[in-house]
A protein has these predicted regions:
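Phosphate-coordination/substrate-recognition cap region in phosphate-metabolizing enzymes
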Residues: 38-103, 166
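Short active-site segment of divalent metal-dependent hydrolases/proteases
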Residues: 13, 152-153
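Acidic, His/Gly-rich catalytic cores of divalent-metal-dependent hydrolytic chemistry
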Residues: 191-208
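Domain-level recognition of soluble alpha/beta enzyme cores
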Residues: 163-189
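Short, basic/glycine-rich phosphate-binding loops at helix/coil junctions
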Residues: 17-20, 101-115
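Generic beta-sheet signal
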Residues: 5, 142-148
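Glycine-rich phosphate-binding loop signature in dinucleotide/nucleotide-binding domains
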Residues: 45-48, 135-142
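Loop-to-helix element that buttresses phosphate recognition and phosphoryl-transfer chemistry
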Residues: 5-63, 67, 115-129
């Protein structure tokens, strides 16, 4: 039986709407985010997940609890968003103004980029690689759900596709579903990306 993992991004927050960088700040879902969480929960209600992991940040954990519908949810720090250090809580336009040189390196996709007092791009990717390896080795043959953040889920796509550059990755919208599968010790394969068909009536936001 193949190992399957379903990643779901958390629902919308006010920071997503206002283009404020969250990173590992613990921002809550807004009203629309809660509604999105209910919709993705309805979408996944019949899926027999063997284990459910979530980032321990509340916007992801609440989304996971909606999907779990009473089943156990395991909060793990490894699923947190990129730690952006001093940039966390700032508007993107403020970052572009105050950190113009650092932004150039960020946009280049270099693994050497490190936000002030934050986590380097290389360490962020390594965190995703280790988590995906752990799933394959410790939960082989299981059906796994992971609720996380847009930046982290994009890192898992890089792991699966063997990419190194951080930028130029497709959007992962609020409560989007992304799936991977692996047979035994084989490589992960992408099954679907950014499936938001349950959100037909919603406006979309893509912030970190």
């Amino acid at each position: 039986m193949p190992t399957t993992v379903c990643f779901v991004r958390h629902g919308e927050t006010d920071a997503n709407v206002t283009d404020r960088l969250q990173g590992q700040s613990d921002t809550p879902l807004n009203a629309q985010g809660l509604a999105q969480a209910e919709l993705v929960a309805a979408r996944l209600k019949d899926e027999p997940f063997d284990i459910i992991f979530s980032s321990d940040l509340s916007r992801a954990l609440v989304t996971a609890e909606k999907i779990a519908a009473g089943r156990p949810v395991i909060p793990v720090k490894e699923l947190r968003e990129w730690h952006f250090g001093r940039w966390q809580g700032m508007l993107w336009k403020e970052i572009l103004c105050d950190y113009s040189e650092e932004i150039l390196l960020f946009k280049s996709g270099s693994p050497d980029f490190e936000p002030p007092e934050g986590e380097s791009a290389g360490r962020f990717l390594e965190r995703a690689e280790k988590f995906m390896d752990m799933l394959k080795s410790e939960y082989a043959g299981k059906r796994i759900l992971c609720v996380s953040h847009g930046g982290f889920i994009k890192q898992t796509l890089k792991v699966v596709l063997g990419l190194r550059s951080f930028r130029r990755l497709p959007a992962c919208e609020n409560t989007a579903i992304c799936r991977y599968a692996a047979k035994e010790e084989d490589f992960w394969q992408l099954v679907c990306w950014n499936d938001t068909s349950h959100l037909k009536s919603f406006n979309r936001s893509t912030g970190w």
